[in-house]
């Protein structure tokens, strides 16, 4: 009886797990080779390996590709999924209001033209029928195209991409930089380099052309309690900004700064009369629906405008994914008509706080020229190893060489064989000061704490051996005495 019961239980579990009308686990299995074909063989980024230009550059992607494609295909990209993310890179993206609610998952630079230039994005993957989505300074003429995974993928060049190592002759103080809005910051980085040290270079004159047109606000289902706080008693409240004098011929973005959200149950907005008028059944269903409302740990803003739609996601402090982000930029890109009106839909009831809601427009006319100025004196004969980067450069003025690799205290640098100070440039990148002349620069990376860790490990092994050996020696000594 026990054996029959056991066998019957196994059969029932198998049916529940693999049955088509049950869990249907079989449907989750894939044939052998599926992972390889999906992540490598049919990866759109394979088109990059067909390029003649195999120097050091990054690419961005406007097509769907597997997570961590740059790592899988040994190319340099702008997207990655990595839990142990470089904290300085996270700080830079936070300053720039990158529209990503978590620190470890980045999917490109969201077509922000100045960032594509500053990060050395030389190429973009895009479907030939979607070139209208390319950032402004990308050429619409593809330099490479291929049939991959049943679809055509093309590679389009950026006409203003900076090289991996470029020089700045002026610096921006941390105080000046921090006082700027996210779009003004990305604009300013084209005029100089942000350094933590002071007095290394002359102060930069910011020449960017970022404007925030005045907008009239209209509320629908939302109450403004003070200058920064808005209360939505029910789901779906709306804040509409109408721009009287729209700005044309620019890259347009919607900027949110200082966002916070406090959840309240829609039941709180209902009067006793409204609840009493409902049937007991409907009242119980409503109470059940909002029973766990207070557990909400994230919220989003839906954006509706005359030039497109968008979405901004925000994780509250009680979320396991909260990472201190309160500023966000949604880039609408460039369009034939200017942004005239945008509606922010508040999906859930509650208190929303915004230090700033604004539309910002950045003129791109001078971006290419400013990038050309930064890249005029750049690192040549670049060699990039596993833990090193080197090259030669000639400068005509006192400059800071900015290298587009994430900063870490593990980096050291020599200039003409002499150790020099590694600077933290633009919050997240490597830098080194150079005097006029021709120089050989070599950066070397060593994991911070590696030597101390190895020494402690060796000491632990010796101590373990001693703990094992001492009793054995004592035992042997006692035997000899006997």
Which residue ranges define each predicted feature?
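Conserved luminal/periplasmic juxtamembrane motif of membrane-embedded glycan-processing enzymes
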Residues: 1-220, 235-236, 294-310, 315-356, ...
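Active-site-proximal, structured, solvent-exposed surfaces of multi-pass membrane proteins
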Residues: 212-482
């Amino acid at each position: 009886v026990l054996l029959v019961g056991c066998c019957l239980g196994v059969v029932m579990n198998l049916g529940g797990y693999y049955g088509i009308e049950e869990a249907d686990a079989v449907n989750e299995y894939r044939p052998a080779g599926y992972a390889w074909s999906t992540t490598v063989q049919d990866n759109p980024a394979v088109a990059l390996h067909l390029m003649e230009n195999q120097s050091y550059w990054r690419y961005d992607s406007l097509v769907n590709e597997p997570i961590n494609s740059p790592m899988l295909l040994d190319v340099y990209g702008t997207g990655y999924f990595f839990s142990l993310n470089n904290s300085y890179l996270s700080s830079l993206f936070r300053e720039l209001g990158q529209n990503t609610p978590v620190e470890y998952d980045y999917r490109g630079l969201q077509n922000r033209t100045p960032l594509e230039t500053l990060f050395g994005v030389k190429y973009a993957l895009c479907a030939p029928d979607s070139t209208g989505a390319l950032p402004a300074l990308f050429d619409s003429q593809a330099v490479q195209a291929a049939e991959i995974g049943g679809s055509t993928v093309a590679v389009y060049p950026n006409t203003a991409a900076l090289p991996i190592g470029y020089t700045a002759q002026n610096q921006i103080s941390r105080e000046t930089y921090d006082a700027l809005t996210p779009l003004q910051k990305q604009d300013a980085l084209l005029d100089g380099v942000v350094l933590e040290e002071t007095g290394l270079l002359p102060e930069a004159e910011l020449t960017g052309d970022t404007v925030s047109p005045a907008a009239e606000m209209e509320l629908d289902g939302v109450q403004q309690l003070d200058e920064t706080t808005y209360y939505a008693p029910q789901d779906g409240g709306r804040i509409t900004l109408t721009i009287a004098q729209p700005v044309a011929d620019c890259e347009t973005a919607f900027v949110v700064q200082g966002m916070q959200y406090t959840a309240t149950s829609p039941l709180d907005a209902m009067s006793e009369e409204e609840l009493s008028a409902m049937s007991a059944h409907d009242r119980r269903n409503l109470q059940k629906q909002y029973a766990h409302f207070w557990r909400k740990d994230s919220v989003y803003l839906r954006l509706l405008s005359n030039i497109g739609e968008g979405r901004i996601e925000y994780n509250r402090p009680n979320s396991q994914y909260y990472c201190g982000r309160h500023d966000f930029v949604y880039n609408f890109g460039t369009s034939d008509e200017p942004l005239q009106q945008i509606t922010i839909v508040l999906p859930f009831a509650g208190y929303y706080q915004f230090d700033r809601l604004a539309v910002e427009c950045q003129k791109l006319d001078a971006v290419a020229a400013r990038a050309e100025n930064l890249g005029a004196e750049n690192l040549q004969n670049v060699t990039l190893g596993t833990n090193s980067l080197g090259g030669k450069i000639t400068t005509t003025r006192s400059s800071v060489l900015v290298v587009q690799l994430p900063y870490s205290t593990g980096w050291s640098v020599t200039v003409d064989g002499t150790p020099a100070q590694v600077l933290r440039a633009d919050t997240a990148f490597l830098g080194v000061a150079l005097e006029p002349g021709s120089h050989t620069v070599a950066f070397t990376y060593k994991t911070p704490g590696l030597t101390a860790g190895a020494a402690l490990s060796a000491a632990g092994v010796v101590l373990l051996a001693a703990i094992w050996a001492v009793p054995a020696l004592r035992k042997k000594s006692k035997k000899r005495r006997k």
